[in-house]
């Protein structure tokens, strides 16, 4: 799958279902805890520097951001979870917004769940994965920050994540570095299977 980086646009930042765009395209959700590098991942996958705004402040994305990717699919950036400085009320509101989207959106074909390759999945990572499985959403786990791990240890870290998440055999996992940017085609190939 090839995408033209010049044909990418942010359609809308939505907080409720009536704002979701009607494009007729399949959607791929991107979830992950705050600061796992979702915006950086989006930018590296589409070959644009600042399409998805990156922030040093975790918990910045508070809307569902719908990106039309070259009229081939829509990336949906979901608010990061597990950020302590967000009030309980805000967390509950995010939770409801995400649940509505995941449980009711027919266009949603796949969720890419980003986890940090360097660490064990957090309780929130495990909850999110189980939540996606509860709603029978195909899930593709991308373990970010691969460049921060010695090459010989990557497989061990991936196996650990698979075990801790109790991943289903049909769900795929890959390690990725936005710095190296060398596995984009593999990731697009997995995405393409679900469109």
UniProtKB/Swiss-Prot annotation:
GO terms for molecular function: GTP binding; metal ion binding. The keyword Lipid biosynthesis does not apply. InterPro entries: G_ENGB_dom, GTP-bd, GTP-bd_ribosome_bio_YsxC, P-loop_NTPase, Small_GTP-bd. Coiled coil: none annotated. Mg(2+) binds at residues 39, 61. Keywords: Cell cycle, Cell division, GTP-binding, Magnesium, Metal-binding, Nucleotide-binding, Septation. It holds the Pfam family MMR_HSR1. The keyword Metal-binding applies. Its cofactor is Mg(2+). GO terms for biological process: division septum assembly. Residues 24-195 form the EngB-type G domain. GTP binds at residues 32-39, 59-63, 77-80, 144-147, 176-178. GO terms for cellular component: cytosol. Belongs to the TRAFAC class TrmE-Era-EngA-EngB-Septin-like GTPase superfamily. EngB GTPase family. Necessary for normal cell division and for the maintenance of normal septation. This is Probable GTP-binding protein EngB. The gene is engB.
